[in-house]
């Protein structure tokens, strides 16, 4: 019996097809092992007044190290944004919509600017509380919209609150007792709204007030604040990232 001869051209073609299949398999494996985080919100996740890496990027880097998987962050937060602005982003901004659709975790920190301190209201809490119903509605709508955009795959919504929605630590104390009391009351209201939104929607919740001020909210958080007293410094962003990483890793099972 004569040995079967292989046509050189066919042999080369078969090799190229095999090589292509291997490349596709490798690409699929790489894509499957990578994860993505998208951050939405105001100047805190944006990293204002801190020449440092903001917490969304830090949390992605920390998760990459702890899990051995590639985790990348896209930071779509904008300084000055309110909950109304974030909701508009999720409805009208095609880039943000595409980012969220592909995300495995969406970090959202918003609400402080909805009740931002102003001279006309001063420390009169009742002057700010009329803004709370709209904030609560927007938080629910934001989470609902994110869940709609990520309906095709497993994704985790992470809601973060605030250590103070106004100035914090020694910066708040410098404005007097009435300012400190009003800041604490408004922070209570905003943080409660965020915590309830997380509970009602099944989202993850990160208690930054506890992270910065301890379990009883009694510690002075000044050492976590930048020079404006309103935003985190590098240590503050790392503290937020550590708290957020723990929640994401547990809820998504990235370990």
What are these regions (language model features)?
Residues 36-41, 45, 72-77, 104-109, ...:
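Structural recognition of the beta-strand scaffold that forms the well-ordered cores
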Residues 163-255:
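Catalytic His-Asp segment of secreted/periplasmic serine-dependent ester chemistry enzymes
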Residues 88-133:
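Oxyanion-hole/transition-state-stabilizing segment in secreted/luminal serine hydrolases
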Residues 28-79:
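Serine-esterase "nucleophile elbow" of acetyl-processing enzymes
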Residues 2-31:
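Secretory targeting and sorting signals
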Residues 43-46, 78-84, 111-117, 163-168, ...:
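Solvent-exposed loop/turn segments at secondary-structure junctions
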Residues 60, 64-68, 91, 95, ...:
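Sec-exported extracytoplasmic/periplasmic mature domains
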Residues 26-33, 86-104, 141-151:
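Short amphipathic alpha-helices and their capping/turn segments at secondary-structure boundaries
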């Amino acid at each position: 019996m004569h040995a079967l001869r292989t046509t050189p051209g066919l042999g080369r073609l078969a090799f190229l097809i095999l090589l292509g299949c291997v490349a596709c398999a490798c690409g699929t494996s790489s894509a499957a092992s990578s994860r993505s985080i998208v951050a939405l919100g105001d100047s805190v996740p944006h990293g204002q007044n801190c020449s440092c890496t903001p917490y969304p990027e830090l949390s992605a880097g920390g998760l990459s190290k702890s899990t051995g998987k590639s985790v990348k962050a896209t930071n779509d937060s904008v300084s000055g944004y309110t909950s109304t602005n974030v909701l508009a982003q999720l409805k009208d901004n095609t880039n943000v919509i595409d980012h969220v659709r592909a995300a495995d975790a969406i970090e959202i920190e918003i609400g402080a600017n909805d009740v931002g301190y102003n001279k006309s209201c001063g420390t009169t809490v009742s002057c700010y509380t009329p803004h709370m119903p709209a904030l609560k509605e927007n938080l629910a709508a934001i989470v609902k919209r994110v869940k709609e955009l990520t309906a095709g795959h497993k994704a985790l919504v992470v809601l973060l609150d605030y250590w103070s929605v106004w100035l914090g630590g020694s910066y708040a104390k410098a404005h007097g007792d009435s300012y400190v009391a009003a800041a604490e009351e408004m922070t209570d209201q905003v943080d409660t709204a965020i915590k309830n939104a997380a509970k009602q929607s099944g989202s993850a919740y990160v208690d930054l007030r506890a992270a910065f001020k301890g379990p009883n909210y009694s510690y002075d958080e000044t050492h976590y604040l930048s020079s404006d007293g309103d935003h985190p410094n590098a240590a503050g962003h790392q503290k937020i990232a550590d708290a957020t990483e723990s929640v994401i890793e547990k809820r998504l099972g990235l370990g």
